[in-house]
């Protein structure tokens, strides 16, 4: 059993708690986003502003002295000095990365390399760098360069190399909290890369496949790392270090820094200049001269001098609240909390033994050198299905717990840990329309992001326990999704505005309608792009209103002719079009037009006699040629038909009920190699929903879709028709055998439902419709 060992004394903890008493009943667990500022810190900053006259450093030398004092404190914080590193103030860590991208001199033939698991700001550098090639490195590619790694050594970078290459990676991943071994820095600088990585772009038709003749420079994104881990620049000497001070102190925002080594300074070529970055410039010629002092050359315009001066209070507060090697102690504290949290999450299990949590990390939580104070995960149901991170965010918010969800601006780590291939990424961002920062959390049941908790020096063990209890209460005690949805909906007004919209989307919704105008042929689909479809007393308008019969007048089905699934009906305007391969035919939708020009015929559907109109020789000839069958005809139902045993439920040419409903979550549980859409098509349902929980639909007795109430008539008993791939006509037995295995020998999949009559049916029948996106309420 992993226990948390307190890092702070009782007196220290009491002092820290007093500084953050404003949290009250709230629990703050997003220190990777920003840590919190202490009360005395901002009071001291305000007192200094009241006491001192701090004006533009171009005007007042005293302000410049304050700023220089802050530079000294920053260098001291990272255990270095002004002889080895320059401090350039920027707006934030992103601006520091941009500064490097803008000004790094690749000397023609150098390459830009970046780690896959990086903040999007590093991806943005690709748009600016003037490199010969751009390469993506995985975490493992970078770790091949660890000093004690037994591998074939890369040739040392030539002393006479003319090109300069830049390697950028995070000291700590802001998604998972994994810490990169910093010993790779010196190895890369001296010997280049063992692996160049995957070429993303190249100016050459044949990009380099091995280490090139180049000087190698390292840019370290330390924004997440420096907030709670000591970065010793005497021991590890990256050429560029990007930091964000609000992540360390909580206040002020709007100021970051770029630490540049003497070596790194030699390859930054300043082009733009502004404000106090020059000794002189002539307006009538191009002549100008940059400042001699390095940081003065790169700090364009007036610095945010008030914010910079307030950093002094941040350093002082940290040293006062966590005395004696502050950042080292903070590192031990947050790692201990993360280790405890991760262990407790592993213990959370459903009654059937299934784990509640899937964790995302590379190396576990035993080694502080490899893992920071961050835990990323997703919640799962007792059947192994994922709970959307948006729902978890809502539950946390209602328990007054602040945490982070999504991809955390680290889409590369998201792609790696969630195992999203490029095709899935396209489906998420291009087809489904997800954007960074939204609450689009599941696509076909698979997560598009995660939940993250991260800890700071003011985080207490009680905060972690409260978070863990929230998960237990929400997902182990309240196991049914409908109960959770009701809990969230009842308190939705208490949620932040960004989450209120997500709360409205928790209930399952109607995803798709499928109309089968011609019995046993392909579906005509209605989804969110096409909107709504009318209802009649028999079901969806035009559903199974036509059928193909053989020369004996018997209904033709896919059991006898699998090619029927390749006939694609389309309803276009006032016409029904039938398409097969490259050919097509059409006929009017109007029943009166068809009846006036057609002969009456009789056939049977499921042993019931039906009456219809023959649709004529033209379509019959087309069907015969398409299917390769003689004597086939197309009939259209002409009279109402009732379900067996009832005079109330009117049917089209369906086998048993007005509607067949299938849950995509249930289909996903079958886990076939074909696409989910292909498997859904096998079941030939009219109404497709996605509850997130497999086979939940089998427990329904009634449901309301939009404003329309339905009753459940029972489960659909399946036959070998579902073995036919509806896109190819090929047969395979896996679908039926899998269902039989999962349902203990029962061939049930999907449910039959019928619309309950209402007082307005006769008056408003033409206005009754189902709309994709309608909320589904189960009773």
UniProtKB/Swiss-Prot annotation:
Keyword Transit peptide: no
Superkingdom: Eukaryota
Modified-residue entries (N6-(pyridoxal phosphate)lysine), positions: 247
Cofactor(s), by name: pyridoxal 5'-phosphate
Pathway info: Cofactor biosynthesis; molybdopterin biosynthesis
Domain MOSC positions: 624-779
EC number: 2.8.1.9
EC class (word): transferase
InterPro entries given in the database record: Aminotrans_V_dom (IPR000192), MoCF_Sase_C (IPR005302), MoCo_sulfurase (IPR028886), MOCOS_middle (IPR005303), PyrdxlP-dep_Trfase (IPR015424), PyrdxlP-dep_Trfase_major (IPR015421), PyrdxlP-dep_Trfase_small (IPR015422), Pyrv_Knase-like_insert_dom_sf (IPR011037)
Phosphoprotein listed as a keyword: yes
Residues forming the catalytic site: 409
Post-translational modification Phosphoserine, affected residues: 732
Protein role: Sulfurates the molybdenum cofactor. Sulfation of molybdenum is essential for xanthine dehydrogenase (XDH) and aldehyde oxidase (ADO) enzymes in which molybdenum cofactor is liganded by 1 oxygen and 1 sulfur atom in active form.
PANTHER family: MITOCHONDRIAL AMIDOXIME REDUCING COMPONENT 1 (PTHR14237:SF19), MOLYBDOPTERIN COFACTOR SULFURASE MOSC (PTHR14237)
Matching HAMAP family: MOCOS
Protein name: Molybdenum cofactor sulfurase
Organism of origin: Drosophila mojavensis (Fruit fly)
Origin organism lineage: Eukaryota, Metazoa, Ecdysozoa, Arthropoda, Hexapoda
Gene: mal
């Amino acid at each position: 059993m992993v226990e948390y060992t307190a890092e702070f004394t009782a007196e220290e903890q009491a002092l820290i708690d007093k500084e953050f008493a404003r949290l009250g009943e709230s629990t703050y667990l997003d220190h990777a986003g920003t840590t919190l500022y202490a009360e005395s810190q901002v009071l001291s900053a305000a007192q200094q502003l009241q006491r001192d006259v701090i004006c533009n450093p171009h005007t007042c030398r005293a302000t410049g002295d304050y700023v220089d004092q802050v530079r000294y404190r920053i260098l001291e914080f990272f255990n270095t000095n002004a002889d080895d590193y320059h401090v350039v103030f920027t707006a934030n860590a992103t601006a520091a990365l941009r500064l490097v991208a803008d000004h790094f001199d690749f000397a023609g033939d150098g390459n830009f390399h970046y780690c896959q698991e990086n903040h999007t700001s590093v991806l943005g550098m690709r748009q600016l760098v003037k490199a010969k090639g751009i390469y993506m490195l995985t975490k493992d590619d970078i770790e091949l360069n660890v000093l004690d790694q037994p591998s074939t050594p890369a040739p040392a970078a030539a002393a006479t190399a003319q090109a300069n290459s830049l390697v950028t990676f995070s000291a700590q991943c802001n998604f998972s909290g994994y810490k990169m071994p910093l010993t790779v820095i010196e190895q890369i600088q001296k010997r280049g890369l063992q692996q160049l990585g995957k070429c993303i772009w190249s100016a050459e038709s044949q990009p380099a496949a091995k280490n090139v003749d180049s000087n190698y420079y390292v840019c370290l994104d330390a924004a997440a790392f420096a907030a709670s881990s000591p970065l010793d620049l005497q021991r590890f000497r990256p050429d560029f270090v990007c930091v964000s001070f609000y992540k360390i102190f909580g206040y002020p925002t709007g100021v970051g820094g770029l630490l540049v080594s003497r070596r790194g300074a030699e390859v930054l070529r300043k082009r733009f200049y502004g404000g106090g970055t020059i000794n002189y410039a002539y307006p009538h010629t191009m002549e100008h001269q940059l400042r001699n002092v390095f940081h003065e050359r790169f700090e364009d315009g007036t610095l945010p001098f008030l914010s910079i001066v307030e950093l002094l209070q941040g350093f002082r507060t940290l040293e006062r609240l966590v005395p004696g090697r502050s950042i080292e102690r903070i590192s031990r504290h947050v790692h201990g909390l993360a280790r405890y949290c991760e262990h407790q999450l592993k213990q959370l299990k459903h009654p059937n033994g299934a784990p509640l949590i899937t964790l995302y990390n590379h190396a576990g939580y035993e080694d502080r050198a490899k893992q920071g104070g961050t835990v990323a995960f997703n919640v799962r149901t007792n059947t192994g299905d994922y709970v959307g991170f948006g729902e978890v965010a809502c539950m946390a918010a209602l328990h007054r717990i602040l945490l982070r969800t999504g991809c955390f601006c680290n889409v590369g780590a998201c792609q790696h840990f969630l195992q999203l291939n490029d095709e899935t990424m396209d489906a998420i961002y291009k087809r489904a329309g997800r954007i960074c920062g939204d609450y689009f959390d599941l696509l076909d049941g698979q997560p598009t992001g995660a939940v993250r908790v991260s800890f700071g020096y003011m985080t207490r063990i009680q905060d972690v326990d409260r978070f863990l209890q929230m998960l237990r209460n929400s997902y182990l005690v309240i196991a049914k999704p409908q109960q959770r949805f009701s809990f969230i909906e009842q308190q939705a007004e208490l949620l932040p505005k960004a989450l209120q919209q997500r709360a409205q989307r928790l209930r399952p919704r109607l995803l798709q309608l499928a109309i089968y105008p011609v019995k046993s042929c392909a579906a005509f689909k209605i989804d969110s792009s096409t909107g709504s479809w009318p209802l009649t007393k028999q079901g969806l308008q035009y559903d199974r209103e036509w059928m193909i019969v053989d020369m004996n007048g018997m209904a033709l089905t896919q059991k006898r002719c699998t090619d029927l699934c390749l006939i694609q009906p389309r309803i276009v305007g006032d016409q029904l079009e039938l398409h097969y391969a490259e050919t097509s035919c059409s006929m009017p939708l109007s029943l009166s037009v068809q009846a006036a020009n057609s002969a009456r015929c009789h056939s049977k559907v499921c042993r019931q006699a039906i009456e219809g109109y023959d649709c004529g020789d033209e379509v019959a000839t087309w069907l015969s040629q398409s299917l390769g069958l003689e004597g086939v005809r197309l009939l259209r139902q002409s009279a109402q038909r009732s379900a067996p045993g009832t005079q109330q439920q009117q049917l089209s040419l369906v086998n048993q009920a007005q509607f067949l409903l299938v849950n995509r979550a249930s289909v996903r549980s079958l886990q076939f190699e074909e696409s989910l859409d292909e498997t859904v098509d096998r079941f030939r349902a009219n109404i497709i929903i996605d509850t997130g929980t497999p086979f939940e639909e089998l427990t329904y007795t009634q449901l309301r879709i939009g404003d329309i109430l339905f009753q459940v008539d029972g489960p659909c008993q399946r036959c070998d028709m579902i073995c036919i791939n509806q896109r190819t006509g090929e047969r395979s037995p896996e679908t039926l055998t899998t269902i039989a295995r999962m349902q203990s020998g029962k061939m049930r999949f999907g449910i039959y439902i019928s619309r309950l009559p209402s007082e307005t049916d006769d008056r408003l029948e033409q206005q009754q419709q189902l709309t994709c996106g309608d909320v589904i309420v189960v009773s």
